[in-house]
Curated annotation (Swiss-Prot):
InterPro entries according to UniProt: ATP_PFK (IPR022953), ATP_PFK_prok-type (IPR012003), PFKA_ATP_prok (IPR012828), Phosphofructokinase_CS (IPR015912), Phosphofructokinase_dom (IPR000023), PKF_sf (IPR035966)
Residues at which substrate binds: T127, I128, D129, R164, M171, G172, R173, E224, R245, H251, I252, Q253, R254
Activity control: Allosterically activated by ADP and other diphosphonucleosides, and allosterically inhibited by phosphoenolpyruvate.
Listed GO CC annotations: 6-phosphofructokinase complex
Catalytic site positions: D129
Upper classification of the organism: Bacteria, Pseudomonadati, Campylobacterota, Epsilonproteobacteria, Campylobacterales
Binding residues for Mg(2+): D103
The organism's place on the tree of life at top rank: Bacteria
Organism of this sequence: Sulfurovum sp. (strain NBC37-1)
Protein name in UniProt: ATP-dependent 6-phosphofructokinase
Family indicated by similarity: Belongs to the phosphofructokinase type A (PFKA) family. ATP-dependent PFK group I subfamily. Prokaryotic clade 'B1' sub-subfamily.
Sequence positions that bind ADP: R156, G187, A188, E189
Residues that coordinate or bind ATP: G11, R72, S73, G102, D103, G104, S105
Length: 327
């Protein structure tokens, strides 16, 4: 093992630059030559591969996004383009490639691995959705949760001042993790996610009772997976008789200064990935499991459905409980 490369694929997350910094510094520390692949799998096809140096990662640890850029590649789905990508890696003498991304990126990595036996591939879960099976944490999640927290705290100020209901839509793709954790930690009165069935009649009874007792505003957090945010806004106005507003947080959840936790997790993920490559590991994903960083088969990560921890879901079910009273 002499030369290793790294790329970012799919949606960007805060913490990727911290991962790049650790990649360069730890590679040199282990006597390896680090390479950057710009623009994800697209860059792999277009041979945008170059040696990396300390100067390339100076000052980037506190910056969100990724210095080497990312992409979603349609061309990469075709074997002819993947063969070009492999030849480009071989042309630079690359022995191992680290891929930061989600399940789609890992499926692409699996295809590369199946089509060659002379290059090692290791994935690092990187998505704010936190929806990757086999790992309890994905890079970027903590920064995203803190961005959502700041937004909801600010919205609560105006909601309480005007006496309104605010329905806040958060990202997560098909997973309700972001919405659930954000609702719990921001004191929301309603949380709607695909993993927990809900009954609006139960909420109606509780909210009308709270209005009679003097409550003047409500905060609802809704997962984008449900695709019903506008419907919930209308429900508040028609059933609860309160002026309502919708806020779609959108891509502010992806950017921003990485938290200390994401920076530290980036260092751990990359260290484990490089160590795995040096040991001859191929076609694996570094997963965080009960405080440990473990390499797991791609098929156990990219091809399985992520399930939110049952203890966390139990807290989510309490939102419809009459005992669930938030301040």
């Amino acid at each position: 093992m002499k030369n290793i490369a790294i790329l970012c694929s799919g949606g960007d997350v805060s913490g990727m630059n911290a991962a790049l910094k650790r990649f360069v510094e730890y590679a040199f520390d282990q006597g390896l030559t680090p390479f950057f692949v710009e623009n994800g799998y697209e860059g792999l096809i277009d041979n945008k591969i170059s040696k990396a140096d300390y100067s390339d990662v100076a000052g980037i640890i506190s910056i969100g996004g990724t210095k080497i850029r990312t992409s979603r590649s349609e061309r990469f789905k075709e074997i002819s383009y993947r063969q070009i990508a492999l030849e480009n890696l071989r042309g630079h003498g690359i022995d191992g490639l680290i891929v930061l991304g989600g399940d789609g990126s890992f499926k692409g990595m699996q295809k590369l691995s199946d089509e060659c036996n002379d290059i090692g591939f290791i994935g690092i879960p990187s998505t704010i959705d936190n929806d990757i099976a086999g790992t309890q944490y994905c890079l970027g999640v903590d920064t995203a949760l803190n961005a959502i927290r700041v937004a909801i705290d600010s919205i609560r100020d105006t909601a309480s001042s005007f006496g309104r209901a605010f329905v806040i839509e958060v990202m997560g793709r098909e997973c309700g993790y972001l919405a659930l954790v954000s609702a719990l930690t921001s004191g929301a009165e309603m949380c709607l996610i695909p993993e927990v069935p809900y009954n609006l009649e139960v909420y109606k009874e509780e909210f009308l009772e709270e209005k009679e007792q003097g409550r003047t505003y409500f905060i609802a957090v809704v997962s984008e997976a449900l695709k019903n945010t506008e419907q919930i806004v209308r429900w508040f106005e028609e059933e609860i008789d309160i002026e309502s507003r919708m806020t779609v947080l959108g891509h502010i959840q992806r950017g921003g200064i990485p938290t200390v936790h994401d920076r530290l997790m980036a260092f751990h993920f990359v260290t484990s990935a490089i160590d795995a490559l040096r040991e001859g590991t191929k076609s694996k994903v570094v997963c965080y499991d009960d405080g440990m960083f473990i390499c797991k088969d791609i098929k156990d990560v990219a091809f399985k459905k992520y399930m939110i921890d049952e203890d966390l879901l139990a807290l989510g079910r309490e939102f419809e409980s009459p005992q669930h009273k938030q301040v």
